[in-house]
């Protein structure tokens, strides 16, 4: 989990409170309970302050990120670049989809760049290189999402002709949603092996998405994936989102996805 952005839910603090006091004699009075009451009250008070500080820190981090994201957004607008933020769980097929996508966009003459977020390594970036697009890996290490500052650092290196920037965020359906990168839109991916209930379990992502890509449709039948339930759950959370069904393996739905990207570029 992220150790710096505050998106980790737990507080890793060890409080050692020796409650068993050996006074050498037994008190037949109620003051021991009074002591416990005061002790508990003090600790409740401490935890309240700790929670307030934690929330304040989280908000400060988000506010700082939002300011940089707005600068990124202005940078994109000034150069006519459409930036899209792809968010999903690990293994949903983001990189496989981008492989097919870059091939199609290169054939169509669309100048494209890709920024790939992963904790470590450059495996995904290596898969995407040589497909007619500028590709750069961003290693986030112990973090669980890309930040606007990390994106800003990479922008000067983008080719001047770039019209579309595809950002493959870290595999996580929670934390990346809160961190605006300056993108024009968030794109959520839901693969058939993940099940139909993910929009209900992770509503923030699907509510924020301009489009939902239902991926790995070639596996739907063998997995017993209930397509109608999945679509109903997506619509329940976000009635306005575009929903595209596709398979990177068979190419099903790929043309509609490329058409969607071209429309976003021209908006």
Predicted regions and their residues:
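Canonical P-loop GTPase G-domain recognition
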Residues: 220-267
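Short histidine/acidic/glycine/proline-rich micro-motifs that form metal-
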Residues: 141-142, 218-220
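Flexible, active-site-proximal loop/turn residues at the rims of small-molecule/cofactor binding pockets
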Residues: 11, 171, 192, 218
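Extreme N-terminal, non-catalytic leader segments
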Residues: 1-84
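Conserved phosphate-donor/acceptor-positioning beta-strand/loop module used by diverse small-molecule
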Residues: 183-193, 210-215
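Nucleotide-state-sensitive switch-loop elements of NTP-binding domains
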Residues: 51-74, 78-87, 92, 96-184, ...
């Amino acid at each position: 989990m992220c150790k710096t952005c505050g998106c980790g839910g737990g507080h890793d603090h060890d409080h050692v409170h020796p409650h068993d006091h050996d006074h050498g004699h037994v008190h037949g009075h109620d003051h021991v309970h009074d002591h416990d009451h005061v002790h508990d009250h003090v600790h409740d008070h401490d935890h309240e302050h700790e929670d307030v500080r934690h929330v304040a820190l989280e908000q400060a981090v988000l506010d700082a990120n939002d300011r940089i994201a707005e600068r990124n957004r202005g940078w994109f607008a000034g150069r006519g670049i459409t930036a899209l933020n792809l968010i999903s769980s690990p293994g949903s097929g983001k990189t496989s989809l981008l492989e097919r996508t870059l091939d199609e966009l290169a054939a169509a003459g669309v100048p494209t760049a890709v920024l790939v977020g992963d904790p470590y390594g450059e495996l995904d970036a290596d898969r995407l290189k040589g497909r007619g697009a500028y590709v750069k890996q961003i290693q986030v290490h112990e973090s669980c999402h890309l930040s606007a500052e990390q994106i800003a650092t990479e922008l000067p290196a983008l080719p001047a002709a770039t019209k579309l920037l595809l950002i493959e965020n870290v595999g996580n359906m929670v934390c990346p949603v809160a961190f605006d990168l300056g993108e024009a839109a968030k794109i959520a991916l839901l693969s058939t092996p993940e099940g139909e209930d993910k929009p209900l379990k992770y509503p923030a992502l699907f509510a924020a998405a301009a489009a939902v890509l239902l991926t790995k449709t070639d596996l739907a039948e063998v997995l017993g994936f209930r397509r109608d339930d999945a679509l109903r759950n997506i619509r329940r959370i976000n009635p306005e989102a575009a929903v595209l069904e596709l398979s990177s393996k068979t190419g099903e739905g790929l043309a509609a996805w490329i058409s969607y990207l071209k429309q976003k570029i021209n908006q």
